[in-house]
């Protein structure tokens, strides 16, 4: 591998722009369909777009701030000395593959990926498990670096530090490289988007792309007639299953009667009373229009409906 660019004093916008030039570790799981928070459809649009999306949130901020601490704990647990990479790296054999490493391990052909984990997600790290999209990220780093192994140190808030060692598997890396290069060649280069996969992140991406409707335009969807039929079939099945599910819940309620809680092998059931206050918006609009307008926000969205014409 080679250093593509130093990240010391590199503005974040420039760093994000460099990442558009190839496939990075965080792209790998999305391209493989393993990332629950990001999809191949989103990766594609990020790569072809000139827009630099500087997305940040509290979880990402904490992950950055605690990276030093996780690396320090890893060194304490293992005795390995680590150092910052301070660069975007590029595979010399497969130049499309780029990587930002959290840490490199001194004196070894190995690296370290630092993670912070909510205790609510601790089960995903139990019994030696690693979330699939993180494993794909590490395999990508192994493909770029040519190293022998990679470590993942995951700090589960308030509980423990979990350390895993991932050893290079040449067949796994070969398959990953093939998938990543196929994605780039078949989609990014010809600018042909991959099909969305039904995840919420793809819905958000599509809604963002087409925020405003054209009331004077009607699209011909004849080519999608088969898909629309399939959707209708699925809708009918879901409706039937929802009714069956509700009928079971009704039987459970009849058995519970006035009991707030119920138990069965492997299940805990609750049926408890609660009270809530809701604003009568219609009355407020009528009797206090100034106050209603003062605390009202205009929200723009496109409502999507499909009606089956028998």
Where are the regions that the model predicts?
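Accessory terminal regions of nucleic-acid processing enzymes
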Residues: 1-310
């Amino acid at each position: 591998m080679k250093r593509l660019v130093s990240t010391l004093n590199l503005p974040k916008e420039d760093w994000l722009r460099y990442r558009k030039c190839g496939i990075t570790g965080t792209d790998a799981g999305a391209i493989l369909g393993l990332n629950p928070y990001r999809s191949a459809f989103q990766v594609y649009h990020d790569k072809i777009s000139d827009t630099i999306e500087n997305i940040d949130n509290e979880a990402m901020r904490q992950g950055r701030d605690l990276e030093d601490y996780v690396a320090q704990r890893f060194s304490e647990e293992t005795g390995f000395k680590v150092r910052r990479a301070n660069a975007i790296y590029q595979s010399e054999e497969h130049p499309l593959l780029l990587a930002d490493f959290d840490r490199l391990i001194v004196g070894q052909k190995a690296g370290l990926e630092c993670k912070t984990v909510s205790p609510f997600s601790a089960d995903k790290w139990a019994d030696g498990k690693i979330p699939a999209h993180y494993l794909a990220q590490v395999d990508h780093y192994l493909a770029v670096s040519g190293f022998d192994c990679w470590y993942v140190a995951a700090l589960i808030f308030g509980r423990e530090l979990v350390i895993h060692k991932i050893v290079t598997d040449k067949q796994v890396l070969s398959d990953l490289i093939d998938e990543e290069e196929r994605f780039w060649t078949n989609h990014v280069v010809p600018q042909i988007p991959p099909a969305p996969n039904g995840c919420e992140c793809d819905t958000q991406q599509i809604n963002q792309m087409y925020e405003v409707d054209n009331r004077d335009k009607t699209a011909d969807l004849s080519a999608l007639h088969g898909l629309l039929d399939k959707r209708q079939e699925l809708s009918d099945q879901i409706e039937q299953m929802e009714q069956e599910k509700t009928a079971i819940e009704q039987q459970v309620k009849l058995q519970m009667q006035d009991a707030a809680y119920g138990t069965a092998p492997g299940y805990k059931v609750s049926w408890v009373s609660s009270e809530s206050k809701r604003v009568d918006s219609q009355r407020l609009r009528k009797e206090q229009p100034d106050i209603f307008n003062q605390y009202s926000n205009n929200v723009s969205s496109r409502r999507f409906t499909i009606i089956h014409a028998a």
